C-alpha cells in the first residue's frame, strides 16, 4: 500500500473519483424550492437532478481498474469472509437430501421452496498442510479435521439458526490432476506444426505457455503487462473448475437452479477471492443459450464459487462458533454424513483414492504443473533425461528435456515471486520499434503496432521465449507460502501442544530464520500427503501411469460434457482481457463508448 493510503483511512464506502473508471456521474442534490411562482422559468443549465441513491462500487468494478487497486481490493476482499459463511448458513436451511440406491435426491416440495440451499465446499492441499503443521498432525488427519468441522455433528451442524452444514467436501486435487492432463495436452498442441493441430490456433496460447492457476499473477498481467495475455493457459484453475463441476452437476442431478448450490472454497491466499469475483467464472460462461440468452433464473450471473476464505479465516470461523478444531474426532465421517454424489460415475471420479503423485518435492508446492508437463514429454521420449539448472535464487529454476543423444527436446522453467516474474516479463516483452528518423523497421512491426509479436503461435524475439512452458506463481516459495496461510505467530496461539510449533514459549515476533523454518514445516506436511496416500494404496491397485491418468480424465470429462449437453471447451476454458486505466486522461478526451456502455450496463459491477 502506498504511503498516501493506510488501513485507518479506509471505510466500507469508496466514493467514485477521478481515478475510478466506474461510469457513475456525481451530481448535486435536488434542493427543494419554496417558490410558489407558477410562471417561474428555469433554464436548462439550472435544472437540478433527482436525488439518486448513493453510488456503489463492487469488487468486480475494482478488478476492472488499474488505478486504486490496492486500497479498493483490500476493502472489498473483506466482503468474502467467515462472517459471510455464518450469515449464509443462518439465512438458509440446508436442502434435505433423501438417499436411495441411485444416490441422493430432493423432494419436489423441497426443490421448489426457494429458501433452502445445498452447501458444498472445496479444500486445497495447501490448507490441509498449514493445519497439519499448526496442530502437529498428519495431512490425512487434517483432512478428517476439516470434514468433521464442515459436515460432522460436532462442527458447524452443532450450532446456528438451522444447524446447516456442508453436504459434500471436495478435494481440489481431483480437478488439479485433471488440469495437469489438459495442460500437457495444451502444451503439446502448441509444439505441433499448425497443420497438425487438433485445436484452432485462435484458442491456443502462444509459446511459451504461462500457467494461469495463480490469480495474483493473472491480475498483475491483466493490469500491467497485457502483452503476455496471449501466452496464458486457457484452462481454469482447480478452484474455478471445481466450482463449475459442482454447480453444473448438482443443479442438473437434483433439479435445482445453480443459485441454490452454495459453494465455499478454502484456499491459501486472498487473491483467490478476486478470482471468484471474475464474471468469466459464472454460469454465464457455460449455461445453455436460449435465443442467445443464458438459461438462468435471473439476469444476475451466478458465481461458480460463491465465497472464498483462507486458512486463517477457517480458524476464525471455528472460534466464532466456539468450536475447538483440535478436539474434533480425527477420523472419517459416519456414512450418514457423507451422501453419495448424485451421479455414480462422477462420484467415483470425484472421491477416488489419491495416489499423491503430484505432491512430491520434485513437483513443488504449487500443484506440480511444470513437473507433470516434463514427465509427460519424458514418457513420450524414452531414454530422455531432465536436466535442472538453478537460477539466481531458489524461486527460479530452468529445465531441459535432453534426448539420449544430448539434444534438447524442450525447455521449461519455474518463476515464483513478483521480483522474478518481472524478470520473466522483460524477457517476453516484444522489441519496440525505434522512433529515430531513418531507423530500420522490422517486417513484423511494419503494420504500425510496435508491440505486435512476430506470429500468433511462434516464439517472439525475447530471450525467454525458447521455453515451451513456464510455471508462474506470485508467492515466493509457492502456494504453501500464500498470504492467507496460518503464520507462525497464529500457530503459537492456536496450538494446544508445546510440541506443535518451534519456540512456542517465545511470544516475540518471529525472526526470518523462524519464519523460514515454519514454511519448511508446512512444506513437509504438504509433501507427507504422498506417503499417506502410499499407505492407503498398500494392498490395492498401483498408482496410475501417465497414459492411464490421461485416459481416466478424458473419459470422465467427456461423460460430464455429454451429461450436461455443454461443449467441454465452455466448461474447462476461460478468457482474459486487458484492463485499461483512465487515470491521468483528460476529462475531454474521447470516451471508449463500447467499454463504458459495457460497464454501465452491468448492474452491481463487472469486468
Swiss-Prot record:
Keywords: 4Fe-4S, Iron, Iron-sulfur, Metal-binding
Transmembrane region(s): none
Alphabetical list of SUPFAM superfamilies matching this protein: Fe-only hydrogenase
Pfam families given in the database record: Fe_hyd_lg_C
UniProt superkingdom: Eukaryota
Compositionally biased intervals (Polar residues): 29-40, 452-461, 494-505
Keyword Ribonucleoprotein on entry: no
Residues annotated as binding [4Fe-4S] cluster 2: 214, 269, 475, 479
GO MF: 4 iron, 4 sulfur cluster binding; iron-sulfur cluster binding; metal ion binding
GO biological process: iron-sulfur cluster assembly
Binding-site list for [4Fe-4S] cluster 1: 20, 62, 65, 68
InterPro entries given in the database record: Cytosolic_Fe-S_CAF, Fe_hydrogenase, Fe_hydrogenase_lsu_C
Region (Disordered): 28-47, 439-461, 494-513
Gene3D superfamilies: Fe-only Hydrogenase (Larger Subunit), Chain L, domain 3
Similarity comment: Belongs to the NARF family.
Function summary: Component of the cytosolic Fe/S protein assembly machinery. Required for maturation of extramitochondrial Fe/S proteins. May play a role in the transfer of pre-assembled Fe/S clusters to target apoproteins.
Name the UniProt record assigns to this protein: Cytosolic Fe-S cluster assembly factor nar1
Organism name: Aspergillus oryzae (strain ATCC 42149 / RIB 40) (Yellow koji mold)
Amino acid at each position: 500500500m502506498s504511503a498516501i493510503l493506510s488501513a485507518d483511512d479506509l471505510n466500507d464506502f469508496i466514493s467514485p473519483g477521478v481515478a475510478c473508471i466506474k461510469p457513475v456521474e456525481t451530481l448535486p442534490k435536488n434542493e427543494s424550492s419554496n417558490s410558489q411562482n407558477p410562471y417561474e422559468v428555469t433554464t436548462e443549465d439550472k435544472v437540478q437532478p433527482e436525488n439518486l441513491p448513493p453510488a456503489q462500487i463492487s469488487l468486480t468494478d475494482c478488478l476492472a481498474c488499474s488505478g486504486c487497486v490496492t486500497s479498493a481490493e483490500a476493502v472489498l476482499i473483506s466482503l468474502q469472509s467467515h462472517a459471510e459463511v455464518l450469515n449464509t448458513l443462518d439465512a438458509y436451511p440446508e436442502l434435505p437430501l433423501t438417499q436411495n440406491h441411485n444416490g441422493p435426491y430432493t423432494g419436489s416440495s423441497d426443490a421448489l421452496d426457494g429458501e433452502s440451499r445445498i452447501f458444498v465446499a472445496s479444500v486445497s492441499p495447501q490448507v490441509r498442510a498449514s493445519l497439519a503443521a499448526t496442530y502437529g498432525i498428519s495431512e490425512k488427519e487434517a483432512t478428517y479435521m476439516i470434514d468433521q468441522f464442515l459436515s460432522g455433528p460436532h462442527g458447524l451442524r452443532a450450532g446456528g439458526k438451522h444447524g446447516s452444514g456442508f453436504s459434500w467436501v471436495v478435494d481440489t486435487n481431483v480437478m488439479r490432476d485433471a488440469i495437469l492432463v489438459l495442460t500437457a495436452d495444451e502444451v503439446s498442441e502448441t509444439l505441433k506444426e499448425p497443420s497438425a493441430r487438433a485445436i484452432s490456433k485462435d484458442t491456443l496460447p502462444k509459446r511459451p505457455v504461462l500457467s494461469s492457476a495463480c490469480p495474483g499473477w493473472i491480475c498483475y498481467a491483466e493490469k500491467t503487462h497485457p502483452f503476455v495475455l496471449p501466452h496464458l493457459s486457457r484452462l481454469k484453475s482447480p478452484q474455478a473448475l471445481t466450482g463449475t463441476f459442482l454447480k453444473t452437476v448438482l443443479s442438473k442431478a437434483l433439479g435445482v437452479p445453480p443459485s441454490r448450490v452454495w459453494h465455499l472454497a478454502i484456499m491459501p491466499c486472498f487473491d483467490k477471492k478476486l478470482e471468484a469475483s471474475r464474471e468469466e467464472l459464472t454460469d454465464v460462461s457455460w449455461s445453455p443459450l436460449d435465443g442467445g440468452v443464458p438459461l438462468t433464473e435471473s439476469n444476475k450471473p451466478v458465481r461458480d464459487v460463491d465465497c472464498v476464505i483462507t486458512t486463517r479465516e477457517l480458524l476464525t470461523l471455528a472460534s466464532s462458533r466456539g468450536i475447538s478444531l483440535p478436539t474434533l474426532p480425527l477420523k472419517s465421517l459416519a456414512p450418514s454424513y457423507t451422501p453419495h454424489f448424485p451421479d455414480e460415475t462422477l462420484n467415483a471420479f470425484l472421491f477416488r483414492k489419491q495416489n499423491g503423485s503430484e505432491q512430491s518435492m520434485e513437483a513443488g508446492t504449487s500443484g506440480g504443473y511444470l513437473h507433470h508437463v516434463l514427465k509427460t514429454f519424458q514418457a513420450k521420449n524414452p531414454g530422455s533425461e531432465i536436466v535442472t539448472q538453478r537460477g539466481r535464487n531458489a524461486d527460479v529454476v530452468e529445465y531441459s528435456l535432453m534426448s539420449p543423444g544430448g539434444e534438447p527436446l524442450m525447455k521449461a522453467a519455474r518463476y515464483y515471486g513478483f521480483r522474478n516474474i518481472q524478470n520473466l516479463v522483460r524477457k517476453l516483452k516484444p522489441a519496440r520499434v525505434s522512433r529515430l528518423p531513418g531507423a530500420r523497421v522490422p517486417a513484423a512491426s511494419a503494420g504500425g503496432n510496435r508491440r505486435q509479436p512476430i506470429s500468433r503461435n511462434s516464439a517472439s524475439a525475447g530471450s525467454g521465449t525458447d521455453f515451451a512452458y513456464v510455471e508462474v506463481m506470485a508467492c515466493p516459495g509457492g502456494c504453501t507460502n500464500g498470504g492467507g496461510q496460518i503464520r507462525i505467530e497464529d500457530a503459537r496461539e492456536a496450538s494446544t501442544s508445546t510440541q506443535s510449533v518451534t519456540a512456542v514459549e517465545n511470544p516475540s515476533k518471529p525472526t526470518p530464520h523462524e519464519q523460514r523454518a515454519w514454511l519448511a514445516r508446512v512444506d513437509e506436511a504438504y509433501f507427507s500427503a504422498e506417503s499417506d496416500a502410499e499407505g492407503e494404496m498398500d494392498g490395492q491397485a498401483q498408482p496410475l501411469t501417465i497414459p492411464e491418468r490421461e485416459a481416466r480424465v478424458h473419459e470422465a470429462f467427456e461423460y460430464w460434457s455429454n451429461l450436461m449437453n455443454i461443449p467441454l471447451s465452455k466448461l474447462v476454458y476461460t478468457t482474459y482481457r486487458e484492463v485499461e486505466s483512465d487515470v491521468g486522461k483528460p476529462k475531454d478526451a474521447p470516451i471508449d463508448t463500447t467499454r463504458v456502455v459495457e460497464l454501465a450496463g452491468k448492474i452491481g459491477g463487472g469486468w
